[in-house]
Regions:
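N-terminal pre-domain/capping segments
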Residues: 4, 18-146, 166, 177, ...
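Bacterial N-terminal signal peptides
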Residues: 8-16
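Acidic/histidine-rich catalytic cores of soluble enzymes
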Residues: 36-40, 177-275
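Hydrophobic faces of well-ordered beta-strands that scaffold small-molecule active sites
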Residues: 40-46, 69-71, 109-114, 152-154, ...
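Active-site groove signature of glycoside hydrolases
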Residues: 144-165, 186-201, 295-296
Length: 322
């Protein structure tokens, strides 16, 4: 779809949604726009720390077509030195508060974005440190059972040193197998997200994280148990449809955002700032049989834009297909 058409359509739909509510986007003042409902539910990533889990905010999101959330911001519970910041009792109380509000608003917790960083890296070479990462991440997963998430999402690594990639892969696989057992014990599915890596080197002393290309993601996923799934982030790789098709039914979750494949842009897909071809992406999601939420991890102005944008992308895809 031409980008100018996308922008024009988005401007029009956003105007209709603003002036008369998201439900009425089907009727244009002068011309009739028949928009078909898209197949997936809509979700978006919200941090634990802010006010997004307050009941009124969750209710608002639900009222404009959001059914799921991914919970991020786990740094509210654990610091970058792997120390829990709160007592377990306090963590449980906060999680219960969030779950109660989500239930009352009718919002389901689809996924948890687990914490990441140099000292929370599943692929650490030092065994004492790696075991401590697994222990702390595992304990956090057990506490997060309160939220009844379906998906627990991990980054495969942080930045790597030079020429240690193979060793890091082996360490990641060890950690993932161990954490997968904890994730299974709370009736959730573990997924590992592809990360940004347009070139191997981040700078002269560091390599980009693991799962930076389609080929590397395939290689590592093939070495992991089948019960561990893949999460495809649309702003971490150029032409994400290629990764979606390579993962197929192994893909259990997504991060919807636009970008250039070179930076952590997390642009809103209808902003026309990124380079993704959403028709190709939606076709790939269809072909892969993905049935989870259309989970935004992107900038947005207002929650009401999330469903409107997905609906527009979906109708563009339908019109391009036939
Ligand atoms: Zn992501």
């Amino acid at each position: 779809m031409k980008r100018s058409v996308l922008l024009l359509t988005w401007t029009f739909l956003a105007f209709v949604a603003c002036s008369s509510g998201a439900e009425e986007t089907k009727t244009a003042p002068t011309d009739k726009v028949e928009l078909k409902d898209p197949p997936l539910k809509v979700g978006y990533s919200i941090p634990f720390g802010g006010d997004k889990f307050e009941l009124k905010n969750l209710k608002y999101a639900k009222s404009v077509g959001v059914d799921y959330v991914e919970v991020s911001g786990m740094s509210a519970f654990i610091d970058d030195q792997r120390n829990f910041k709160l007592s377990e009792l306090e963590i449980k109380e906060r999680l219960k508060w969030a779950k109660k509000n989500a239930d009352e608003a009718g919002i389901k917790i689809w996924s948890i974005h687990m914490p990441f960083g140099a000292n929370l890296d599943l692929s650490l070479v030092n065994e004492t440190n790696r075991r401590d990462v697994v222990a702390k991440q595992g304990r956090l997963v057990e506490l997060l059972e309160i939220l009844e998430p379906q998906i627990i999402l991990f980054h495969p690594s942080y930045y790597l040193g030079l020429n240690e990639r193979d060793l890091r892969k082996a360490q990641l696989i060890k950690s993932a197998k161990e954490l997968n057992e904890v994730v299974k014990s709370i009736n959730a599915t573990m997924v590992i997200e592809n990360l940004l890596g347009p070139e191997l080197l981040k700078d002269e002393n560091r390599e980009r994280p693991l799962l930076r290309t389609v080929q590397e993601t395939i290689e590592i996923m093939n070495r992991l148990p089948n019960s561990i799934g893949s999460a495809v982030d649309m702003n971490h790789i150029k032409n994400p449809e290629e990764l979606i098709l390579a993962m197929g039914s192994r893909m259990k979750s997504v991060h919807i955002a636009d970008g250039t494949g070179k930076h952590e842009n997390h642009y809103f897909p209808c902003s026309v700032k990124g380079q993704n071809d959403w028709t190709l992406i939606l076709a790939a999601l269809d072909k892969a049989g993905y049935r989870g939420p259309f989970m935004y991890e992107s900038a947005y102005d207002d929650e009401k834009d999330l469903m409107v944008c997905y609906k527009m992308l979906y109708n563009n895809y339908l019109n391009a297909s036939y």
